[in-house]
Every structure is written in structure tokens, then in C-alpha cells.
UniProtKB/Swiss-Prot annotation:
Domain commentary: The HXXXXD motif is essential for acyltransferase activity and may constitute the binding site for the phosphate moiety of the glycerol-3-phosphate.
Top class in the EC scheme: transferase
Listed name of the protein: Lysocardiolipin acyltransferase 1
Organism: Danio rerio (Zebrafish)
Protein's UniProt keywords contain Disulfide bond: no
Positions occupied by motif HXXXXD motif: 85-90
Length: 388
């Protein structure tokens, strides 16, 4: 069953991503050829404006409540974020947390390569230099290394989101996780899947080796009511009433070095998640049992009336201003873009040209993030030749 509010939510995001990619990001593509680092600095901030749109729709229009407990983020720090993958949409819901406690412009996501082909969303993700993986380590290792080393060389302060479980929690994926646990003599999990640690250990070691990592944030996400497992649930109007995030921050010095140590460390985090989520879903009302940290600037955020919150880099008033401004801006921008396509032939030609470009470049070059890497390598060689 299709819900009007679900259709409006997804349509608004789709139009924003398509028009934003064409009219906001498209004119900046030539800068990538001249200065990849400046191109990255500017496009990160433009993409971040769109990332506020889903947050604005979820919180202001749909009334979703966000609860964050545990440790805080240090604004501007470079980190790897690991999170349990309860639904296919956790990455989008996380923006509600990062908007308050970090900077959306820093976020990169490690996600499956198929999403690169989605019109609008995939184009913007390519411009944002998200890391697309094929889920074949022999193929992904080289690409991941190139992307991470690029971020290190241009001193890009990224916060890279990774789902070590590799897929969202469903009955089928839980059954496969249980089968893996039986074969390896491990505990069976009910609320999480056993993590795959190869990518995590490689990312942490690479960023640490490139002096581009300050911390690892372990985030546990939970939904007390209404769990939208897939995009189809959003289309049917199923949105969470509350989204709970529990954040644990580990300094890079406290995280083990080497594959074996990192593997054991990550597995221990998942054992903790299982226990934490079990307590969460057995508690009435459902909430993470965490002490208050810092000063709360919001009203009580849980049904129990207890206010548990973490230090933030933005006050709740500032967050509301950002969300209202985002909703107004994107409403006007989408309306203006539609009007220009109806009334302005040059805009129609430009739009058609950019759509064809986005589709063709992926077919022939593999994606804009790969073009950006190639441009960086070219200018690096030019600089090295001049120094010689």
C-alpha cells in the first residue's frame, strides 16, 4: 500500500538530489580538473546542504524524535564510525545525529556499488566521493586504498561510516549469521549480525598510517516503534516514531593496532551491542540505559521523563533554524528548477546535457569519484616533475 506522505517524502528527496546534482554540483565539475582538493572542499559543503533535507522532513514534517546518549563527538575530528545495520536506511537516519553532534560535510559512507547507478542520489554520492564497494575483497581492497590515501594526502578530515555487518538485519541474514556462528563456535545473536572485520581493520590501519584518524565512534541504533526496513516501507508511510543512538568514542590511541587486535576489538564491540540492544528492547519504555553527559539543552527526550543527552556542537535552537532554513531553501529551489525546465529552453538543454553526462561518465569512467582520483594523480605527478 502506498501512502501519500511516503510518496511526498521520497519524491521530495529525489527531486532535490536530481536538481541539486545538475544545477548545484554540475557547474563545479570543471574545477575538479583544475584543483581536486578545492573541488572536494566546496562540494562537501554543498552536498551537506542536501543531507539536512531528509533530517528536516523527518523531524519537522513527520515528527520523528531523535534521542542520542553516551559519548559526544569532538567537532571537526577525523573518525571511523561503525554502526549496527538494523535497516537499509540507517545511514540516512544517522544524519539526524551527526547534524547535532558533528558536521555533515565530513561524512563519507562505505556502501554497495549498486547505489552509484541510482539517478540523483547516486550522482551526488559520486560527487561526494563516497566509497563504493563490490563486496569482493580482492576488487575492493585496491579501490578502498586509493580513496583512503587520497583523503590522507589532501588532508580531508573525514568521518567514514562503515557497517561491518555488511547487510541489514532480517530473518534471512540472521539465519546466515547463526550458521556462521555454529561453524565457528560463536554466540548466536538476536539483535545484531556477526561483523565482517576485514574492511574495518584495513580502513583503521590505513587512516592511522596516513595520520588522518583521531577516534573510532561505535554507534548503536535502535527503533522503539515502527521499523522501516526498506524504502518500500517509507513508500507505505512507515516512519519511526523515535530513533535512538548510543555513541561510544574511542581515541585512536586506545584502539589496538594490527589486524588481529582490531578484529578482536570489533567483535567485542558487537558483543556489547547485543547486550545493550537486549536491555533496550526489554526496558519499558524502551531506551538506552546511559548516564547523562554534559548539559542538556532540550526538553526530556524519553517517555520516562529522564533527560539523557551528550555534549553537542550546535544548540537545539540552532538545529531548528538549520532545519527550517533547509526546508525553505529546498522547497524554493525545487520549485524554481521545475519552473525553469518548463519555461527556459537553455535550462532544458543544460539539464538534458548534464543527465546524459552523468549517465555516460559512469559507463565509460566508472564514476566521478574515480575521475577525481585520476585528476589528483595527474596534478601530483606534475608537481613532482616540477620539483625535480
Amino acid at each position: 500500500m502506498v501512502s501519500p506522505r511516503g510518496v511526498c517524502f521520497l519524491l521530495f528527496l529525489l527531486l532535490g538530489s536530481v536538481f541539486g546534482s545538475v544545477f548545484m554540483l554540475g557547474p563545479l565539475l570543471p574545477l575538479m580538473l583544475l584543483s581536486p582538493s578545492r573541488y572536494r572542499w566546496i562540494t562537501d559543503r554543498i552536498v551537506a546542504t542536501w543531507l539536512t533535507l531528509p533530517v528536516a522532513l523527518l523531524e519537522l514534517v513527520l515528527g520523528v524524535k531523535v534521542v542520542v546518549t553516551g559519548d559526544g563527538f569532538i567537532p571537526g575530528e577525523r573518525s571511523v564510525i561503525i554502526m549496527n545495520h538494523r535497516t537499509r536506511l540507517d545511514w540516512m537516519f544517522l544524519w539526524c545525529c551527526l547534524l547535532r553532534y558533528s558536521y555533515l560535510r565530513q561524512e563519507k559512507i562505505c556502501l554497495k556499488a549498486a547505489l552509484k547507478s541510482v539517478p540523483g542520489f547516486g550522482w551526488a554520492m559520486q560527487v561526494a566521493s563516497f566509497i563504493f564497494i563490490q563486496r569482493r575483497w580482492e576488487d575492493d581492497r585496491t579501490h578502498m586504498s586509493n580513496m583512503l590515501q587520497y583523503f590522507c594526502r589532501i588532508r580531508e578530515p573525514v568521518q567514514l561510516l562503515l557497517f561491518p555487518e555488511g547487510t541489514d538485519l532480517t530473518e534471512n541474514t540472521r539465519a546466515r549469521s547463526d550458521e556462521f556462528a555454529e561453524k565457528n563456535g560463536l554466540q548466536k545473536y538476536e539483535y545484531v549480525l556477526h561483523p565482517r572485520t576485514t574492511g574495518f581493520t584495513f580502513i583503521v590501519d590505513t587512516l592511522r598510517g596516513g595520520d588522518n584518524l583521531d577516534a573510532v565512534h561505535d554507534i548503536t541504533v535502535a527503533y522503539p516503534q515502527n521499523i522501516p526496513q526498506t524504502e518500500r516501507h517509507l513508500l507505505a508511510g512507515v516512519f519511526p516514531r523515535e530513533i535512538h543512538f548510543h555513541v561510544q568514542r574511542f581515541t585512536v590511541a586506545s584502539v589496538p593496532a594490527g589486524a588481529a587486535g582490531l578484529q578482536a576489538w570489533c567483535q567485542e564491540r558487537w558483543r556489547e551491542k547485543e547486550r545493550r540492544l537486549q536491555r533496550f528492547y526489554e526496558t519499558v519504555p524502551r531506551r538506552f540505559d546511559a548516564p547523562a553527559v554534559g548539559v542538556c539543552v532540550r526538553e526530556p527526550c524519553c517517555q520516562s521523563g529522564q533527560c539523557v543527552c551528550v555534549p553537542r556542537c550546535k544548540s537545539e535552537g540552532r538545529v531548528r533554524i538549520i532545519l527550517v532554513a533547509s526546508l525553505l531553501y529546498w522547497s524554493v529551489f525545487i520549485t524554481a528548477a521545475c519552473a525553469s525546465l518548463c519555461l527556459c529552453p537553455p535550462a532544458q538543454f543544460y539539464f538534458l546535457f548534464m543527465v546524459v553526462f552523468f549517465l555516460c561518465q559512469q559507463r565509460f569512467t566508472g564514476g566521478l569519484e574515480l575521475m577525481e582520483l585520476a585528476c589528483h594523480r595527474y596534478w601530483s605527478r606534475r608537481s613532482a616533475d616540477k620539483q625535480e
